[in-house]
């Protein structure tokens, strides 16, 4: 009978699942690793729940780095962001193979697990790169830059890391509308964090946020050693914009003048005789256009294909 370990959907949860499989003493060929939120019950399998543990995940990560390579760990990290519900088991099988063959594992593309990890890593990396190029920010009247994305994979942190380096002094929010979470960057503190469970209503409150009001609370909090998510002590202060603001009725601006100017420029430089929608869709797929300024008024049916 197969034993299925059910883990969380993030990297820590998956690596903890790998650790628990090895620690169980069961035959590895009789074990599978699946995501707890997405698995389908099987009458002929027994199930074990995995509780995410950063210490266990760290041990697996260190082993992968030393035995396989830093590149192997990078591919695993990106594969964990893929949309596939089977990603946890592919990562387990990839690590199992890597612990046996070491650094040469990355070149064994004839192996199904290696090939799948390679494909997932490439797909996630390509989408993150595309969003870096295609993301559009709008300036709210509070001075915050707001960008919205609709990625197929969970690439918000990869994209946010780029913009944290690109706009280090700006206050901005990058919102993943598909997963209802956002990256919040506070320019005065020079750091950013991921907030879960952010709704469209929260984004409306952000339009009334004055960043200067919250900076005093942030200045006393400790900066993290590495760029990335804010430590727990600072998360409540930095995120209270999404929790403590009241939804006062205020008059919304008539429109973004620069957005209208950009749309006009985009339309005016087009050469009708050279118009090639098929080529344009190849270079800029329709799924990326939902929040791109110059395409915001295009037909809804075309946008959602």
Model-derived regions: residue spans:
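N-terminal ordered "arm"
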Residues: 1-54
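Charged, alpha-helical interface segments at or near domain boundaries
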Residues: 35-129
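Intrinsically disordered, low-complexity terminal tails and inter-domain linkers enriched
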Residues: 199-248
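Conserved aromatic-histidine-acidic binding/catalytic patches
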Residues: 3-11, 48, 112, 144-155, ...
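Internal, well-folded beta-alpha domain core
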Residues: 104-200, 211
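Long, compositionally biased intrinsically disordered terminal regions
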Residues: 171, 182-183, 209-214, 240-305
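Short, hydrophobic/amphipathic alpha-helical patches that form generic packing surfaces
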Residues: 13-24, 93-97, 161-165, 260-267
């Amino acid at each position: 009978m197969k034993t299925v370990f059910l883990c969380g959907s993030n990297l820590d949860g998956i690596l903890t699942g790998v650790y628990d499989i090895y620690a169980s003493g069961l035959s590895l060929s009789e074990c599978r690793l699946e995501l707890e939120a997405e698995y389908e019950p099987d009458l002929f399998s027994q199930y074990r729940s995995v509780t995410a543990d950063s210490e266990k995940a760290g041990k697996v990560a260190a082993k992968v780095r030393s035995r396989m390579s830093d590149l192997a760990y990078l591919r695993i990290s990106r594969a964990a962001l893929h949309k596939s519900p089977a990603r946890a088991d592919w990562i387990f099988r990839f690590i199992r193979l890597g612990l046996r063959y070491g650094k040469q594992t990355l070149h064994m593309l004839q192996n199904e697990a290696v090939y799948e990890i390679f494909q997932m890593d490439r797909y996630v990396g390509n989408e993150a790169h595309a969003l870096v190029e295609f993301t559009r920010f709008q300036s709210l009247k509070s001075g915050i830059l707001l960008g919205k994305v609709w990625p197929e994979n969970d690439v918000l942190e990869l994209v946010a890391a780029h913009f944290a380096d690109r706009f280090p002094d700006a206050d901005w929010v990058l919102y993943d509308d598909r997963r209802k979470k956002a990256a919040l960057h506070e320019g005065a503190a020079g750091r950013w964090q991921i907030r879960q469970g952010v709704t469209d209503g929260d984004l409306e409150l952000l339009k009334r946020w004055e960043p200067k009001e919250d900076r005093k609370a942030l200045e006393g909090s400790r900066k993290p050693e590495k760029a990335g998510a804010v430590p727990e002590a600072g998360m409540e202060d930095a995120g209270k914009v999404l929790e403590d603001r009241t939804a006062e009725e205020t008059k919304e601006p008539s429109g973004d003048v620069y957005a209208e100017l950009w749309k006009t420029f985009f339309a005016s430089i087009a050469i009708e005789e050279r118009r090639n929608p098929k080529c344009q869709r190849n270079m800029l797929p329709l799924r990326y256009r939902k929040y791109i300024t110059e395409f915001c008024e295009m037909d809804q049916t075309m946008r959602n294909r």
